Amino acid sequence: MAENIVVFEIPYACPQSQPDHDLMLALATVFNREQEHLGTAALSEATPEEFSACLNPSPDSVVKHRIFVALKASALAEDASGVDPTTGAASKAPKLGVADDASRDRSTASNASANSNTAPVLPHEVRVRDVVGYASLMYWDQPEAKQGYLSVFTDVDYRRQGIGSALHEAAANRARTLGLSIVEGWVVAISDRITPPQREAAVHLPNGDSFPMVPELAATMSWGYELGNVEYMNALHFPMTEDAIAILTARAAEMPSNFQVYSWLDADYPPELADPAKFMESFLRLRSYANEEIPAGELSVENHSHTLASWEALVERDVRAGKQLLNAAICDESGQVVALSTAQRQARPEGVFHQDTTLVAPSARGQKLGWALKAALHKLIVSTCDQPRAILTWNAVSNKSMLHINESIGFHPFLLEGVVQLRL
Protein backbone atom coordinates (compact mmCIF):
# COMPACT_ATOMS: atom_id res chain seq x y z
CA MET A 1 0.00 0.00 0.00
CA ALA A 2 1.16 3.56 -0.66
CA GLU A 3 3.14 4.94 2.30
CA ASN A 4 0.99 8.07 2.46
CA ILE A 5 -2.17 6.10 3.36
CA VAL A 6 -3.15 5.07 6.90
CA VAL A 7 -5.78 2.40 7.69
CA PHE A 8 -7.49 2.21 11.07
CA GLU A 9 -10.75 1.18 12.72
CA ILE A 10 -13.36 3.79 13.56
CA PRO A 11 -14.26 3.64 17.27
CA TYR A 12 -17.44 1.71 17.89
CA ALA A 13 -20.32 3.75 19.31
CA CYS A 14 -18.37 6.88 18.38
CA PRO A 15 -19.56 10.26 19.73
CA GLN A 16 -21.93 12.28 17.57
CA SER A 17 -19.58 15.23 17.14
CA GLN A 18 -19.09 17.32 14.03
CA PRO A 19 -15.79 15.69 13.01
CA ASP A 20 -17.55 12.32 13.16
CA HIS A 21 -20.33 13.62 10.93
CA ASP A 22 -17.73 14.79 8.42
CA LEU A 23 -16.13 11.35 8.50
CA MET A 24 -19.52 9.70 7.90
CA LEU A 25 -20.04 12.07 4.96
CA ALA A 26 -16.66 11.04 3.56
CA LEU A 27 -17.57 7.35 3.78
CA ALA A 28 -20.87 8.00 2.01
CA THR A 29 -19.00 9.89 -0.70
CA VAL A 30 -16.70 6.93 -1.39
CA PHE A 31 -19.72 4.63 -1.68
CA ASN A 32 -21.62 7.02 -3.93
CA ARG A 33 -18.66 7.54 -6.26
CA GLU A 34 -18.55 3.76 -6.66
CA GLN A 35 -22.25 3.74 -7.60
CA GLU A 36 -21.58 6.41 -10.22
CA HIS A 37 -18.76 4.24 -11.59
CA LEU A 38 -21.11 1.24 -11.80
CA GLY A 39 -23.96 3.26 -13.30
CA THR A 40 -26.23 2.56 -10.31
CA ALA A 41 -26.28 6.01 -8.70
CA ALA A 42 -29.96 6.48 -9.59
CA LEU A 43 -30.84 3.37 -7.57
CA SER A 44 -28.33 3.22 -4.72
CA GLU A 45 -26.95 6.04 -2.56
CA ALA A 46 -25.56 6.15 0.97
CA THR A 47 -26.00 8.92 3.55
CA PRO A 48 -23.88 9.96 6.56
CA GLU A 49 -26.80 9.09 8.84
CA GLU A 50 -26.73 5.50 7.61
CA PHE A 51 -23.10 5.01 8.67
CA SER A 52 -23.66 6.78 11.97
CA ALA A 53 -26.67 4.60 12.78
CA CYS A 54 -24.66 1.44 12.06
CA LEU A 55 -21.90 2.52 14.45
CA ASN A 56 -24.36 3.49 17.19
CA PRO A 57 -26.84 0.61 17.60
CA SER A 58 -29.23 0.38 20.52
CA PRO A 59 -28.33 -1.99 23.40
CA ASP A 60 -30.85 -4.59 22.19
CA SER A 61 -29.34 -4.85 18.72
CA VAL A 62 -27.61 -8.09 17.74
CA VAL A 63 -26.54 -6.78 14.32
CA LYS A 64 -23.22 -4.98 14.65
CA HIS A 65 -20.87 -3.19 12.27
CA ARG A 66 -17.14 -2.47 12.31
CA ILE A 67 -15.88 0.11 9.85
CA PHE A 68 -12.27 0.65 8.77
CA VAL A 69 -11.14 3.74 6.91
CA ALA A 70 -8.20 4.51 4.63
CA LEU A 71 -7.08 8.10 5.12
CA LYS A 72 -4.34 10.18 3.56
CA ALA A 73 -1.51 10.48 6.08
CA SER A 74 -1.34 14.21 5.38
CA ALA A 75 -4.79 14.55 6.93
CA LEU A 76 -3.57 13.49 10.37
CA ALA A 77 -3.58 16.83 12.13
CA GLU A 78 -1.85 15.54 15.23
CA ASP A 79 1.27 13.58 16.04
CA ALA A 80 1.41 10.42 18.11
CA SER A 81 1.67 12.43 21.33
CA GLY A 82 -1.85 13.78 20.81
CA VAL A 83 -0.74 17.40 20.30
CA ASP A 84 -1.88 19.41 17.30
CA PRO A 85 1.39 20.48 15.64
CA THR A 86 -0.21 23.58 14.16
CA THR A 87 -1.50 25.00 17.46
CA GLY A 88 0.31 23.13 20.20
CA ALA A 89 -3.07 22.40 21.80
CA ALA A 90 -3.86 19.05 23.38
CA SER A 91 -6.07 16.81 21.30
CA LYS A 92 -9.72 16.21 22.13
CA ALA A 93 -10.27 13.97 19.14
CA PRO A 94 -11.18 10.32 19.73
CA LYS A 95 -8.47 7.78 18.98
CA LEU A 96 -9.01 5.43 16.08
CA GLY A 97 -8.00 1.80 16.00
CA VAL A 98 -9.68 1.33 19.40
CA ALA A 99 -12.80 -0.79 19.76
CA ASP A 100 -14.02 0.80 22.96
CA ASP A 101 -17.22 -1.17 23.55
CA ALA A 102 -15.74 -4.09 25.48
CA SER A 103 -18.87 -4.46 27.57
CA ARG A 104 -21.20 -4.55 24.58
CA ASP A 105 -20.11 -7.51 22.48
CA ARG A 106 -17.82 -10.49 22.25
CA SER A 107 -14.74 -8.52 21.11
CA THR A 108 -13.59 -7.95 24.70
CA ALA A 109 -10.46 -10.02 24.31
CA SER A 110 -9.26 -8.03 21.33
CA ASN A 111 -9.80 -4.59 22.81
CA ALA A 112 -6.78 -4.61 25.10
CA SER A 113 -4.37 -5.26 22.26
CA ALA A 114 -6.06 -2.64 20.08
CA ASN A 115 -5.88 0.06 22.74
CA SER A 116 -2.49 1.66 22.24
CA ASN A 117 -1.10 5.07 23.12
CA THR A 118 0.52 5.18 19.69
CA ALA A 119 -2.70 4.64 17.73
CA PRO A 120 -3.36 7.29 15.06
CA VAL A 121 -5.91 9.90 16.02
CA LEU A 122 -8.78 11.41 14.12
CA PRO A 123 -8.12 14.90 12.76
CA HIS A 124 -10.25 17.72 14.14
CA GLU A 125 -11.67 18.14 10.66
CA VAL A 126 -11.96 15.27 8.20
CA ARG A 127 -12.14 16.49 4.64
CA VAL A 128 -14.03 14.37 2.17
CA ARG A 129 -11.06 14.30 -0.20
CA ASP A 130 -8.80 12.80 2.48
CA VAL A 131 -10.76 9.53 2.77
CA VAL A 132 -9.78 7.15 -0.02
CA GLY A 133 -11.58 3.97 0.99
CA TYR A 134 -13.30 1.98 3.69
CA ALA A 135 -14.26 -1.56 4.67
CA SER A 136 -17.42 -2.54 6.53
CA LEU A 137 -17.79 -5.75 8.54
CA MET A 138 -21.33 -6.70 9.57
CA TYR A 139 -21.90 -9.58 11.96
CA TRP A 140 -24.38 -11.01 14.45
CA ASP A 141 -23.35 -10.59 18.06
CA GLN A 142 -24.53 -14.03 19.12
CA PRO A 143 -22.35 -16.89 20.41
CA GLU A 144 -23.51 -19.30 17.72
CA ALA A 145 -22.96 -16.84 14.84
CA LYS A 146 -19.78 -17.62 12.88
CA GLN A 147 -20.36 -15.76 9.63
CA GLY A 148 -19.77 -12.09 8.82
CA TYR A 149 -20.37 -9.93 5.77
CA LEU A 150 -17.48 -7.82 4.51
CA SER A 151 -17.53 -5.04 1.91
CA VAL A 152 -14.48 -3.12 0.67
CA PHE A 153 -14.69 0.17 -1.24
CA THR A 154 -11.68 2.00 -2.65
CA ASP A 155 -12.18 5.44 -4.17
CA VAL A 156 -12.17 5.18 -7.95
CA ASP A 157 -9.16 7.54 -8.18
CA TYR A 158 -7.00 5.47 -5.80
CA ARG A 159 -7.28 1.94 -7.17
CA ARG A 160 -4.34 -0.41 -7.81
CA GLN A 161 -2.35 0.95 -4.86
CA GLY A 162 -3.00 -1.86 -2.37
CA ILE A 163 -5.53 0.18 -0.39
CA GLY A 164 -8.30 -2.37 -0.80
CA SER A 165 -5.98 -5.17 0.30
CA ALA A 166 -4.96 -3.26 3.43
CA LEU A 167 -8.58 -2.48 4.30
CA HIS A 168 -9.57 -6.09 3.79
CA GLU A 169 -6.71 -7.35 5.95
CA ALA A 170 -7.73 -5.05 8.81
CA ALA A 171 -11.39 -6.09 8.61
CA ALA A 172 -10.58 -9.81 8.26
CA ASN A 173 -8.30 -9.64 11.30
CA ARG A 174 -11.11 -8.04 13.28
CA ALA A 175 -13.45 -10.82 12.12
CA ARG A 176 -11.02 -13.37 13.52
CA THR A 177 -10.87 -11.64 16.91
CA LEU A 178 -14.68 -11.66 16.96
CA GLY A 179 -14.64 -15.44 16.61
CA LEU A 180 -15.98 -15.51 13.05
CA SER A 181 -14.89 -18.34 10.76
CA ILE A 182 -16.35 -17.18 7.41
CA VAL A 183 -16.79 -13.78 5.78
CA GLU A 184 -18.95 -13.21 2.73
CA GLY A 185 -18.65 -10.46 0.14
CA TRP A 186 -19.84 -9.40 -3.29
CA VAL A 187 -18.26 -8.40 -6.57
CA VAL A 188 -20.09 -6.72 -9.42
CA ALA A 189 -20.01 -6.92 -13.20
CA ILE A 190 -21.14 -3.60 -14.63
CA SER A 191 -24.34 -3.41 -16.64
CA ASP A 192 -22.78 -3.91 -20.09
CA ARG A 193 -21.58 -7.35 -18.94
CA ILE A 194 -24.76 -8.54 -17.31
CA THR A 195 -25.09 -11.79 -19.29
CA PRO A 196 -23.30 -14.61 -17.46
CA PRO A 197 -20.28 -15.59 -19.61
CA GLN A 198 -20.03 -18.97 -21.27
CA ARG A 199 -16.72 -19.02 -23.13
CA GLU A 200 -14.77 -15.95 -22.03
CA ALA A 201 -12.45 -15.88 -19.01
CA ALA A 202 -14.72 -16.70 -16.10
CA VAL A 203 -15.14 -18.71 -12.92
CA HIS A 204 -17.66 -21.54 -13.29
CA LEU A 205 -19.76 -23.17 -10.57
CA PRO A 206 -20.86 -26.83 -10.47
CA ASN A 207 -24.48 -25.83 -11.20
CA GLY A 208 -23.40 -24.25 -14.50
CA ASP A 209 -23.51 -20.61 -13.37
CA SER A 210 -20.48 -18.48 -14.11
CA PHE A 211 -19.08 -15.03 -13.39
CA PRO A 212 -16.63 -13.01 -15.52
CA MET A 213 -13.08 -12.68 -14.24
CA VAL A 214 -13.35 -8.94 -13.61
CA PRO A 215 -10.49 -7.26 -11.67
CA GLU A 216 -12.57 -7.17 -8.48
CA LEU A 217 -13.10 -10.94 -8.57
CA ALA A 218 -9.41 -11.52 -9.28
CA ALA A 219 -8.53 -9.37 -6.26
CA THR A 220 -10.86 -11.21 -3.90
CA MET A 221 -9.59 -14.57 -5.10
CA SER A 222 -6.03 -13.41 -4.40
CA TRP A 223 -7.18 -12.81 -0.80
CA GLY A 224 -8.38 -16.41 -0.61
CA TYR A 225 -12.06 -16.04 -1.49
CA GLU A 226 -13.99 -18.55 -3.57
CA LEU A 227 -16.98 -17.81 -5.78
CA GLY A 228 -20.08 -19.45 -4.30
CA ASN A 229 -23.11 -18.02 -6.11
CA VAL A 230 -24.13 -15.69 -8.92
CA GLU A 231 -27.07 -13.30 -8.58
CA TYR A 232 -28.95 -10.77 -10.64
CA MET A 233 -29.81 -7.41 -9.15
CA ASN A 234 -33.23 -6.80 -10.71
CA ALA A 235 -35.04 -3.49 -10.98
CA LEU A 236 -38.73 -2.70 -11.42
CA HIS A 237 -39.39 0.91 -12.36
CA PHE A 238 -42.63 2.66 -11.44
CA PRO A 239 -45.30 3.10 -12.50
CA MET A 240 -45.98 -0.52 -13.32
CA THR A 241 -47.65 -1.14 -16.65
CA GLU A 242 -51.37 -1.93 -16.73
CA ASP A 243 -50.57 -5.43 -18.01
CA ALA A 244 -48.14 -6.06 -15.13
CA ILE A 245 -50.67 -4.87 -12.54
CA ALA A 246 -53.34 -7.07 -14.11
CA ILE A 247 -51.07 -10.13 -13.91
CA LEU A 248 -50.12 -9.37 -10.31
CA THR A 249 -53.73 -8.81 -9.24
CA ALA A 250 -55.02 -11.92 -10.97
CA ARG A 251 -52.35 -14.22 -9.54
CA ALA A 252 -52.75 -12.82 -6.02
CA ALA A 253 -56.52 -13.37 -6.21
CA GLU A 254 -55.89 -17.10 -6.72
CA MET A 255 -54.66 -17.45 -3.12
CA PRO A 256 -57.14 -19.61 -1.13
CA SER A 257 -59.49 -17.68 1.14
CA ASN A 258 -58.34 -19.47 4.30
CA PHE A 259 -55.17 -17.36 4.32
CA GLN A 260 -55.05 -13.81 5.73
CA VAL A 261 -52.68 -11.08 4.48
CA TYR A 262 -51.30 -8.42 6.83
CA SER A 263 -49.11 -5.44 6.02
CA TRP A 264 -47.49 -2.71 8.12
CA LEU A 265 -44.69 -0.15 8.30
CA ASP A 266 -41.64 -0.32 10.59
CA ALA A 267 -42.83 -1.64 14.00
CA ASP A 268 -46.38 -0.25 13.71
CA TYR A 269 -48.05 -3.64 13.74
CA PRO A 270 -51.50 -4.15 12.16
CA PRO A 271 -54.18 -2.91 14.59
CA GLU A 272 -56.43 -5.87 13.77
CA LEU A 273 -53.98 -8.27 15.41
CA ALA A 274 -55.29 -9.60 18.71
CA ASP A 275 -51.79 -10.48 19.96
CA PRO A 276 -49.01 -8.60 18.07
CA ALA A 277 -46.26 -10.19 20.18
CA LYS A 278 -47.42 -13.72 19.34
CA PHE A 279 -47.80 -12.76 15.68
CA MET A 280 -44.25 -11.37 15.55
CA GLU A 281 -42.87 -14.43 17.31
CA SER A 282 -44.27 -16.51 14.45
CA PHE A 283 -43.04 -13.97 11.87
CA LEU A 284 -39.49 -13.99 13.24
CA ARG A 285 -39.43 -17.78 13.59
CA LEU A 286 -40.17 -18.17 9.87
CA ARG A 287 -37.74 -15.42 8.94
CA SER A 288 -34.93 -17.17 10.82
CA TYR A 289 -35.00 -19.92 8.18
CA ALA A 290 -34.81 -17.54 5.21
CA ASN A 291 -31.13 -18.04 4.39
CA GLU A 292 -31.34 -21.82 4.07
CA GLU A 293 -34.45 -21.59 1.87
CA ILE A 294 -32.91 -19.25 -0.70
CA PRO A 295 -30.87 -20.84 -3.55
CA ALA A 296 -27.29 -20.38 -2.36
CA GLY A 297 -25.15 -22.26 -4.87
CA GLU A 298 -21.90 -23.36 -3.21
CA LEU A 299 -22.15 -20.90 -0.31
CA SER A 300 -21.96 -21.88 3.32
CA VAL A 301 -25.27 -20.73 4.83
CA GLU A 302 -25.97 -19.55 8.37
CA ASN A 303 -29.42 -18.72 9.69
CA HIS A 304 -29.91 -15.83 12.09
CA SER A 305 -32.56 -15.41 14.77
CA HIS A 306 -34.21 -12.35 16.31
CA THR A 307 -36.08 -11.67 19.49
CA LEU A 308 -38.80 -9.06 19.24
CA ALA A 309 -36.51 -6.61 21.07
CA SER A 310 -33.57 -7.17 18.71
CA TRP A 311 -35.83 -6.93 15.65
CA GLU A 312 -37.30 -3.64 16.83
CA ALA A 313 -33.77 -2.39 17.55
CA LEU A 314 -32.83 -3.13 13.94
CA VAL A 315 -35.93 -1.31 12.69
CA GLU A 316 -35.17 1.65 14.98
CA ARG A 317 -31.62 1.85 13.63
CA ASP A 318 -32.87 2.08 10.06
CA VAL A 319 -35.48 4.68 11.00
CA ARG A 320 -32.66 6.82 12.45
CA ALA A 321 -30.91 6.44 9.12
CA GLY A 322 -33.96 7.86 7.33
CA LYS A 323 -35.24 4.53 6.01
CA GLN A 324 -38.62 2.84 6.30
CA LEU A 325 -39.39 -0.89 6.51
CA LEU A 326 -42.37 -2.27 4.60
CA ASN A 327 -43.65 -5.64 5.81
CA ALA A 328 -46.14 -8.16 4.47
CA ALA A 329 -47.07 -11.49 6.05
CA ILE A 330 -49.65 -14.20 5.48
CA CYS A 331 -51.18 -16.32 8.24
CA ASP A 332 -52.91 -19.67 7.94
CA GLU A 333 -56.10 -20.65 9.77
CA SER A 334 -54.19 -21.36 12.98
CA GLY A 335 -52.72 -17.85 13.01
CA GLN A 336 -49.18 -18.98 12.18
CA VAL A 337 -47.18 -16.87 9.74
CA VAL A 338 -46.51 -19.06 6.69
CA ALA A 339 -45.23 -16.41 4.26
CA LEU A 340 -43.49 -13.07 4.59
CA SER A 341 -41.76 -10.37 2.61
CA THR A 342 -39.95 -7.18 3.57
CA ALA A 343 -38.74 -4.19 1.58
CA GLN A 344 -36.94 -1.07 2.66
CA ARG A 345 -37.50 2.46 1.43
CA GLN A 346 -34.08 4.03 1.11
CA ALA A 347 -33.26 7.45 2.52
CA ARG A 348 -31.65 8.30 -0.82
CA PRO A 349 -32.43 8.28 -3.67
CA GLU A 350 -36.02 9.18 -2.91
CA GLY A 351 -38.61 6.68 -4.00
CA VAL A 352 -36.23 3.70 -4.23
CA PHE A 353 -36.99 0.45 -2.37
CA HIS A 354 -34.83 -2.60 -1.73
CA GLN A 355 -36.66 -5.91 -1.31
CA ASP A 356 -34.47 -8.14 0.84
CA THR A 357 -36.54 -11.16 1.87
CA THR A 358 -39.44 -13.14 0.44
CA LEU A 359 -40.20 -16.55 1.91
CA VAL A 360 -43.10 -19.00 1.78
CA ALA A 361 -43.01 -21.95 4.18
CA PRO A 362 -42.65 -25.30 2.33
CA SER A 363 -46.03 -26.46 3.64
CA ALA A 364 -47.80 -23.47 2.06
CA ARG A 365 -46.15 -23.36 -1.36
CA GLY A 366 -47.98 -23.72 -4.64
CA GLN A 367 -50.97 -21.65 -3.48
CA LYS A 368 -50.03 -18.23 -4.91
CA LEU A 369 -48.91 -16.83 -1.54
CA GLY A 370 -45.79 -15.37 -3.14
CA TRP A 371 -47.95 -13.43 -5.58
CA ALA A 372 -50.13 -12.19 -2.71
CA LEU A 373 -47.01 -10.93 -0.91
CA LYS A 374 -45.86 -9.04 -4.00
CA ALA A 375 -49.31 -7.49 -4.38
CA ALA A 376 -49.37 -6.44 -0.72
CA LEU A 377 -45.94 -4.79 -0.95
CA HIS A 378 -46.91 -3.01 -4.17
CA LYS A 379 -50.01 -1.65 -2.45
CA LEU A 380 -47.89 -0.44 0.50
CA ILE A 381 -45.39 1.25 -1.79
CA VAL A 382 -47.91 3.20 -3.86
CA SER A 383 -49.98 4.14 -0.79
CA THR A 384 -47.05 5.43 1.30
CA CYS A 385 -44.77 7.00 -1.31
CA ASP A 386 -45.91 9.94 -3.42
CA GLN A 387 -43.45 9.26 -6.22
CA PRO A 388 -42.08 5.70 -6.13
CA ARG A 389 -39.26 5.28 -8.61
CA ALA A 390 -38.02 1.70 -8.42
CA ILE A 391 -37.79 -1.44 -6.33
CA LEU A 392 -34.69 -3.64 -6.42
CA THR A 393 -34.43 -7.32 -5.62
CA TRP A 394 -31.64 -9.89 -5.70
CA ASN A 395 -32.19 -13.38 -7.12
CA ALA A 396 -29.80 -16.24 -7.81
CA VAL A 397 -29.27 -16.86 -11.52
CA SER A 398 -30.24 -20.48 -10.82
CA ASN A 399 -33.61 -19.42 -9.31
CA LYS A 400 -35.39 -19.60 -12.65
CA SER A 401 -38.93 -19.70 -11.25
CA MET A 402 -38.55 -16.47 -9.26
CA LEU A 403 -36.78 -14.74 -12.13
CA HIS A 404 -39.68 -15.70 -14.42
CA ILE A 405 -42.25 -14.34 -11.95
CA ASN A 406 -40.35 -11.09 -11.55
CA GLU A 407 -39.90 -10.70 -15.29
CA SER A 408 -43.65 -11.16 -15.86
CA ILE A 409 -44.44 -8.06 -13.78
CA GLY A 410 -41.69 -5.83 -15.16
CA PHE A 411 -38.45 -6.59 -13.33
CA HIS A 412 -35.32 -6.66 -15.48
CA PRO A 413 -31.71 -7.61 -14.63
CA PHE A 414 -29.60 -4.56 -13.90
CA LEU A 415 -26.33 -5.94 -12.54
CA LEU A 416 -24.64 -9.30 -12.23
CA GLU A 417 -23.18 -9.99 -8.78
CA GLY A 418 -20.81 -12.71 -7.66
CA VAL A 419 -21.12 -13.82 -4.03
CA VAL A 420 -17.78 -14.90 -2.56
CA GLN A 421 -16.73 -16.41 0.76
CA LEU A 422 -13.46 -16.62 2.67
CA ARG A 423 -12.75 -19.17 5.38
CA LEU A 424 -10.70 -17.48 8.07
Residue ranges and their predicted role:
Residues 150, 183-187, 355, 391-393:
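Conserved hydrophobic beta-strand within the GNAT/NAT acetyltransferase core sheet
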Residues 160-176, 360, 366-379:
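Conserved acetyl-CoA-binding loop-helix of GNAT-fold acetyltransferases
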Residues 362-424:
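Short hairpin/turn module used for nucleic-acid contact or packing/dimerization
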Residues 1-13, 168-275, 417-421:
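Acyl-donor-binding surface of acyltransferase catalytic domains
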Residues 38-64, 72-74, 134-144, 291-352, ...:
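A conserved beta-strand-loop-helix scaffold within acyl/acetyltransferase catalytic domains
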Residues 132-139, 147-151, 166:
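General structural concept
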Residues 151-159, 189, 357-366:
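A short, internal acetyl-CoA/4′-phosphopantetheine-binding micro-motif in the GNAT/acyltransferase core
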Residues 1-88, 92-106, 113, 117-130, ...:
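Short amphipathic alpha-helix that is part of the acyltransferase structural core
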